[in-house]
Amino acid sequence: MIRLIGPGGAGKSTIGALLAERLDVPFVDLDRHFAGRVGDISEYIERHGYDAYARENIEAYCSLFREAVCPGVVALSSGFMTYANDAHPEYGRIRREIEEGV
C-alpha cells in the first residue's frame, strides 16, 4: 500500500487518484472516508474537539482494513502523522508502519 502524507492542499488526493488509476489499484481519500462515516470534518472538530477528531480519524483508517477495502493508495489527512501517541490504541503501530514503509 502507498500512503501519501503532507500538508493540506499539497495535492495528495489529486496525485493519489492518478497514481491509483495508473497502477490499477483502489484509491481512498481518508478525509472523504472520514466524512462519509461522521460528517463534515470542521463541524466534527468544532463539536467534539481535535483530540476526538484524531481518535476518530485513526479509527476511520483502521476501518479500511476491517471493511476489506484495503486501498492500494491512500491519501492521509494532513495532520495524521502529528497526532499524540496516545490518540488511539493502534496509533503507535500505524505510525511506525508508515514511517518504516511497511
Spans of features found by a protein language model:
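Conserved substrate/cofactor phosphate-moiety recognition/catalytic segment
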Residues: 17, 21-60
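Conserved nucleotide-sensing/catalytic segment adjacent to the nucleotide-binding pocket
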Residues: 43-85
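The conserved Walker
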Residues: 8
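Walker A/P-loop
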Residues: 13
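ATP-dependent NMP and nucleoside kinases share a basic, alpha-helical "lid"
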Residues: 77-102
